[in-house]
From Swiss-Prot:
This is Large ribosomal subunit protein bL32. GO terms for cellular component: large ribosomal subunit. Disulfide bonds: none annotated. PANTHER family: 50S RIBOSOMAL PROTEIN L32, LARGE RIBOSOMAL SUBUNIT PROTEIN BL32. NCBIfam families: rpmF_bact (TIGR01031). GO terms for biological process: translation.
Amino acid sequence: MAVPARRTSKAKKNKRRTHYKVTAPSVNFDETTGDYSRSHRVSLKGYYKGRKITKAASAE
């Protein structure tokens, strides 16, 4: 098995880890329902791009 020739320094390790981050989800205001929903997804009331796609989710 291959073994690293030198130990990875703290700076090198931390620079590599700077790319591991969480991005906030994009949320848009839906004018049809008056609610906020995520992009490219059907809203809880069953609308997508202002058109009715499915029945609204029931709260059972």
